[in-house]
UniProtKB/Swiss-Prot annotation:
Primary localisation category: cytoplasm
Source organism per UniProt: Bradyrhizobium diazoefficiens (strain JCM 10833 / BCRC 13528 / IAM 13628 / NBRC 14792 / USDA 110)
Catalytic activity: Release of an N-terminal amino acid, Xaa-|-Yaa-, in which Xaa is preferably Leu, but may be other amino acids including Pro although not Arg or Lys, and Yaa may be Pro. Amino acid amides and methyl esters are also readily hydrolyzed, but rates on arylamides are exceedingly low; Release of an N-terminal amino acid, preferentially leucine, but not glutamic or aspartic acids
Gene name for this UniProt entry: pepA
UniProt-recorded name of the protein: Probable cytosol aminopeptidase
Top-level EC class as recorded in UniProt: hydrolase
Length: 499
């Protein structure tokens, strides 16, 4: 993991280096230290704003050549709107906008972390720093040719000029670990499937041991002994053996029940015998976005030494067509003892989750479980790419996830569960079938999963629209978004860490 930029903090009075970024409100008013740094150039900024019809709208940017007397190569003015009532996500966006103004050859940038009424708080400045790193991320390790101006590979040095350097550094030490977790998740989602198969994914998850995370890897023999027939059935058509990885971070009170996060890790999904169309099948390398999030989250929590007991569990398989592959009509027995008729082998993620959820519920007795999965195309039809679908058997957990989604910017939207949907997954030959047809596809998938939580408070996040291939944003220009790491870190920090 490496960054294209290096972020540091300096006093507001420090001399600018490279590109200078400042903030204004919708009246083009600057902060006192900013106005002092620009000197007589403030009038030139106003004239440039008028010529460009720049109104200081939140997130808008005015890019001009640095005026004479300003020690910078370029001057960028970012609008902060009314500059009151701003949230952490606004500052995250400001950082992304600033990073977007870095050219491939830019060596340095100085950002005046000041609003018209004075210096930003340390938390606001740190949110800008996080936005810078998230926007600057790129996955180009397999490119052998660079575009013009990209040669050299040197990192841009970005300085945030702040009111309290020590406080900003301390706050960023923690927030930076969360950004690292997002980057890890993005890397995993972006990797090609010939590189990131179940065994390799398990190896990378095992690297968390360096941070003090306990990691247990279950191989096929161990899973077979446990009776995980639902998960194993999905992977039996692949030459790559399946794995389940259990990660434990014990940062809370000894003996206290953990909170648990479970990720679907289908490293490549052809659909199996119910094979997918060829168009865009390459995107199915990202069908492990839930597992990627869980690994990134466990990194973030361990690196920042979260004061909570946390379990992360991921089921890793490849869903391939083969003479040994699972067939429509097969009946498998899950770890819970419940039997499942396979109607469509492309409804495989819920089979993986069924066994991992049951394992976690029975073996770790968590306070709650949250699973994440790129589970259904139906959720993308329903919610697009702005929200993940959320289903839950516990209102308190659901409300906390909704709030964490708003605060982190990784939004969720609750959809219903109910016994009236059960008949859609009734089977003539087994306890249930693995798909309920076209109607309410995301709901019936969640209804299926609910049968494997053993009464544990639980939420299911369908992240098919948010984990991969979503439109680019101010803080993400990557195909893999790393969705869920910031959301769940916020959930843990707000409600489940000992004070």
């Amino acid at each position: 993991m490496s960054d294209a930029i290096k972020v540091g903090f300096v006093p507001l009075s420090a001399a600018a280096r490279g590109i200078l970024v400042v903030f204004c409100d919708d009246g083009l008013k600057l902060g006192p230290a900013t106005a002092k740094a620009l000197g007589g150039a403030t009038e030139l900024v106003k004239r440039a704003a008028s010529a460009a019809a720049f109104k200081g709208k939140s997130g808008a940017a005015l890019d001009i050549l640095a005026p004479e007397g300003v020690k910078a190569t370029r001057l960028i003015v970012i609008g902060a709107g009314k500059a009151t009532g701003l949230k952490a996500n606004d500052f995250l966006k400001f950082g992304g906008v600033a990073a977007g103004k870095l050219s491939a050859t830019a060596a340095a940038m100085t950002i005046m972390a000041e609003l018209p009424d004075g210096a930003m708080t340390s938390e606001q400045a740190v949110a800008i720093a996080a936005g810078l790193r998230l926007r600057a991320y790129k996955f180009d390790r397999y490119k052998t040719k660079k575009k013009d101006g990209e040669e050299g590979g040197s990192r841009a040095d970005i300085s945030l000029a702040v009111g309290d350097v020590a406080a900003a550094k301390k706050a960023f030490a923690s927030a930076g670990h969360v950004v690292d977790g997002v980057i890890i998740a993005r890397d995993l989602v972006n990797e090609p499937p010939n590189v990131l198969f179940p065994e390799e994914f398990a190896r990378r998850a095992s690297l968390l041991r360096k941070l003090g995370v306990k990691v247990e890897v279950l191989d096929v023999k161990a899973m077979d002994k446990l009776g995980m027939g639902a998960l194993l059935g999905v992977g039996q058509g692949s030459t790559r053996p399946s794995r389940t990885v259990i990660m434990r971070w014990d940062g809370g009170k000894k003996g206290e029940a953990p909170v648990a996060f479970v990720g679907k890790g289908v490293c490549f999904d052809t659909g199996g015998i119910s094979i997918k169309p060829a168009g865009s099948m390459e995107d199915m390398k990202g069908d492990m976005g839930g597992a990627a999030c869980v690994v990134g989250l466990m990194h973030a929590l361990a690196a920042r030494k979260a004061k909570a007991n946390v379990v992360g569990a991921i089921g890793l398989v490849e869903n391939m067509p083969d003479g040994n592959a699972q067939r429509p009509g097969d009946i498998v027995t899950s770890m819970s003892g419940q039997t499942i008729e396979i109607i469509n082998t492309d409804a495989e993620g819920r089979l993986v989750l069924a066994d991992v959820l049951w394992y976690v519920a029975k073996k770790t007795k968590p306070k709650f479980m949250v699973d994440l999965a790129t589970l259904t195309g139906a959720i993308v039809v329903a919610l697009g790419t702005e929200h993940a679908g959320m289903f839950s058997n516990n209102d308190e957990l659901a409300d906390r996830l909704l709030t964490a989604g708003i605060e982190s910017g990784e939004k969720v939207w609750r959809l219903p569960l109910g016994p009236e949907y059960d008949k859609l997954i009734d089977s003539q030959f087994a306890d249930m079938k693995n798909t309920g047809g076209r109607h309410g596809g995301s709901i019936t998938a969640a209804q299926f999963l609910q049968r494997f939580v053993d009464g544990t408070p639980w939420a299911h996040l369908d992240i098919a629209g948010t984990a991969m291939g979503a439109p680019k944003t101010d803080i993400n220009q990557s195909w893999g978004s790393g969705y869920g790491v910031r959301l769940l870190d916020r959930l843990v920090a707000d409600h489940y860490e000992r004070k």
